[in-house]
Amino acid sequence: MNAKTITLKKKRKIKTIVVLSIIMIAALIFTIRLVFYKPFLIEGSSMAPTLKDSERILVDKAVKWTGGFHRGDIIVIHDKKSGRSFVKRLIGLPGDSIKMKNDQLYINDKKVEEPYLKEYKQEVKESGVTLTGDFEVEVPSGKYFVMGDNRLNSLDSRNGMGMPSEDDIIGTESLVFYPFGEMRQAK
C-alpha cells in the first residue's frame, strides 16, 4: 500500500464517522423532542393576553415525571372526548377549595394574587365589568381546576370543560417560540 491509498482510506473513515455522528445526533434530538417536548399551536383567545392566537409554544412533557404541576402553571390538556387539546392556567390542585369573589381569587381561604391578569383586570374594570364571575368549588381528588386567562371568553373548569385529571395533562408551557421576534417564557 502506498501513502495515497492510506490517505484515501483515512479520509473515507473520517467521512463515515462524521456522517454517523450527524445521524446519531439527529436521532438523539428527535428522541428528546418526542419524549420530553412537544410543539403546540395556540388556537383562539382563551389565554389572551398571555398567549395570543397563532403563537406556538414548546410544551415540557417531562414535568409529569420531574416534579409535577404547580398553581399558576400554563398547561396543555388533551380532551379525550373531542380529541382536541387546550391551553389553560392551572388554578387548583386536588383537594383545593376555590372561591372567586368580586374578581378576587381565594384558594383554601387564602387570597391569591394573579399578576398575569393585573393589567387585563384593570382594563375590564374601567369598562364596568368584572373579569371573573363569583363562584365556589371544591376540587375532587385526582382532578385539577383550570381557567383561561381571558376569563370572559374561555371554556374551562367553570363552564363545560370540567376538571382534567393528571392523565389528561400533556405538560407545561416552557417557551413561546413563534413568532421568532416575540420569543419568551409566558408566565
Curated annotation (Swiss-Prot):
Belongs to the peptidase S26 family. The keyword Ribonucleoprotein does not apply. This is Signal peptidase I U. Keywords: Cell membrane, Hydrolase, Membrane, Protease, Transmembrane, Transmembrane helix. The active site is at S46, K88. It comes from the Bacteria. InterPro entries: LexA/Signal_pep-like_sf, Pept_S26A_signal_pept_1, Pept_S26A_signal_pept_1_CS, Pept_S26A_signal_pept_1_Lys-AS, Pept_S26A_signal_pept_1_Ser-AS, Peptidase_S26. One of its GO terms (molecular function) is serine-type endopeptidase activity. One of its GO terms (cellular component) is plasma membrane. It is found in: Cell membrane. It comes from Bacillus subtilis (strain 168). It catalyses: Cleavage of hydrophobic, N-terminal signal or leader sequences from secreted and periplasmic proteins. GO terms for biological process: signal peptide processing. The gene is sipU. The keyword tRNA processing does not apply. Residues 38-187 are extracellular. Induction: Expressed constitutively. Its main location: membrane. Its EC number is 3.4.21.89. B.subtilis contains five chromosomal type I signal peptidases: SipS, SipT, SipU, SipV and SipW. They have different, but overlapping, substrate specificities and have different transcription patterns. PANTHER family: CHLOROPLAST PROCESSING PEPTIDASE, SIGNAL PEPTIDASE I.
